[in-house]
UniProtKB/Swiss-Prot annotation:
NCBIfam families: tyrS. Belongs to the class-I aminoacyl-tRNA synthetase family. TyrS type 2 subfamily. CDD domains: S4, TyrRS_core. It comes from the Bacteria. HAMAP family: Tyr_tRNA_synth_type2 (MF_02007). It catalyses: tRNA(Tyr) + L-tyrosine + ATP = L-tyrosyl-tRNA(Tyr) + AMP + diphosphate + H(+). Keywords: Aminoacyl-tRNA synthetase, ATP-binding, Cytoplasm, Ligase, Nucleotide-binding, Protein biosynthesis, RNA-binding. GO terms for biological process: tyrosyl-tRNA aminoacylation. A motif ('KMSKS' region) lies at residues 226-230. Its main location: cytoplasm. The gene is tyrS. This is Tyrosine--tRNA ligase. The lineage of its organism: Bacteria, Pseudomonadati, Pseudomonadota, Gammaproteobacteria, Alteromonadales. One of its GO terms (cellular component) is cytosol. One of its GO terms (molecular function) is RNA binding.
Length: 399
């Protein structure tokens, strides 16, 4: 395989769809640095591994000498992306957006080279557009065209409201590509309508239309739904090394390969080698450990990755308790507290319903003994180690 073909294969790694692939090949063969754009609306202060799928792809282009533009949608963040939503998304304030944007910059530079990354804000050109410019932009498309979007179509069919400003979101995202003169835009498969809008607007402005490279949405820890904080199935890149290690080790062996393809920087040949080793009898757990250590080293450091590995071995294979276990005191009103309420108050579960479910599954323990009675009452004056699942521990004194 030639160097060019090898580089192109790496750029295609994990991609769900490229529109148009032949265009991308032509652009790459010119040998000129291309402008590669990916936009992120700072709707929450922290990123999770699902967000890094696109950032990793930016890194691949960056390593090949292309100009990477990390676009922070401070303007679009105040509109609220309607993609995949069945209700109008709550818009953020300017202050919220800018505060979140600062944390984004800190986090993405754990992956991208800051010296070779352009950080742009789409308010730079959108604020200058003004009311007249926004109306002119709105005239570029029809309501019928906007209703081709699946989410809008479903909401209309179900009698759910669609706010007028939501129609502006894909137009603004498309105009970002015009303002940046993007050669390539990266996005998730759920963004296809918006990404293609960029091509349409660039054509109408006499620009060469951007190539669209779409990446899949990373499945969360459950292996079914996309990774999302609201679903609780995420791995945050600011998670502690211990939490990150435990979460990665909890994924299925099948999902592990998906994470290797989309999150690991290891060459595909090396990953295929892992598969061969497992076919020949290697324990998949050991391969999963390598993935966990690689990701923790990226977002923390090598020492943290090794320490998290050592703690995992001690806790789950040797039965040791974690060194950083929180110590809590829970005060009762009448000298006793129900086990479900205690676990909720200690933050080991999100609700009493979660507590009952974990007890039923045999996942709640007191001093390493399974709790089998959901009506168990804990008396004041006792101290014990409470555990829920494999990763949540607390030494709790009831008073």
């Amino acid at each position: 395989m030639t160097d060019f073909n090898q580089a192109f294969a790496e750029l295609k790694r994990g991609a769900e769809e490229i529109l148009v692939e032949e265009e991308l090949l032509t652009k790459l063969k010119t040998g000129k640095p291309l402008k590669i754009k990916a936009g992120f609306d700072p709707t929450a202060p922290d990123l999770h591994l699902g967000h890094t799928v696109l950032i990793n792809k930016l890194r691949q282009f960056q390593q090949l000498g292309h100009e990477v533009i990390f676009l922070i949608g401070d303007f679009t963040g105040m509109i609220g992306d309607p993609t995949g939503k069945n209700v109008t998304r709550k818009a953020l304030t300017k202050e919220d957006v800018l505060a979140n944007a600062e944390t984004y910059k800190e986090q993405v530079f754990k992956i991208l080279d800051p010296a070779k990354t352009t950080v742009a804000f789409n308010s730079t050109w959108m604020d200058k557009l003004g009311a007249a410019g926004m109306l002119q932009l709105a005239s570029r498309q029809t309501v019928a065209r906007m209703m081709e979007r699946d989410d809008f179509k479903k909401r209309y069919a179900n009698g759910q409201a669609i706010a007028i400003h939501e129609f502006m979101y894909p137009l603004v995202q498309g105009w970002d590509s015009v303002a940046l003169e993007a050669d390539v835009e990266l996005g998730g498969t759920d963004q296809k309508f918006n990404l293609l809008m960029g091509r349409e607007l660039q054509k109408s402005e006499g620009q060469r239309p951007q190539t669209v490279l779409m990446m899949p949405l990373l499945e969360g820890l459950d292996g079914v739904q996309k990774m999302s904080k609201s679903l609780g199935n995420y791995i945050g890149i600011t998670d502690t090394p211990t939490d990150m290690f435990g979460k990665i080790m909890s994924i299925s062996d099948v999902l592990m390969w998906r994470y290797y393809e989309l999150l690991s920087f290891k060459p595909l040949e090396e990953i295929e080698g892992y598969k061969t080793e497992i076919e020949n009898g290697k324990n998949p757990r050991d391969v999963k450990i390598d993935l966990a250590k690689e990701l923790i080293a990226r977002f923390h450091d090598e020492a943290a990755a090794q320490a998290a590995h050592d703690e995992f071995i001690n806790r789950f294979q040797k039965g040791a308790l974690p060194d950083d276990m929180p110590e809590l005191t829970i005060t009762t009103e009448n000298g006793e507290i129900a086990i479900a309420n205690l676990l909720k108050d200690a933050g080991l579960v999100g609700s009493t319903s979660d507590a009952f479910r974990m007890i039923k599954q045999g996942a709640a323990k007191i001093d390493s003994e399974k709790v089998t009675d959901r009506s168990l009452v804990i008396s004041a004056g006792t101290t014990a180690v409470y555990q829920v699942g494999k990763r949540k521990f607390a030494r709790i004194t009831v008073s």
